[in-house]
Amino acid sequence: ATNSKVMVLVSQNVSVGSTSSGNAIGLQILRDSTPIISTDNILFGFLSLNWGDMAFNYLDSAVGGDGSTSITYKTQLKSRDSGETVTCQNSSNISSITLMEIGA
């Protein structure tokens, strides 16, 4: 609907591996090609290989549109330091994005 907000609920499975400790990642959520929230320094563990699920919630109040246009949400992850490897959905684990429209 016009002027609706969208609650974005993300459960992201991720693993981070490196040859050192103190792994960290950056994550952003995008609406179509526009980043709507971004962080560059999520500490993910103190071992050389770490994995698990991260949860992020975001109320997108600047969706725009007239209610008839499709909107795509997605996540992007990156390593903080060179030499780290970031993998999503490791070992067939599942990630999800749940969207809830909140009327104007």
Show where each model-derived region lies.
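Terminal beta-strand-rich extracellular "head" domains
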Residues: A1-A104
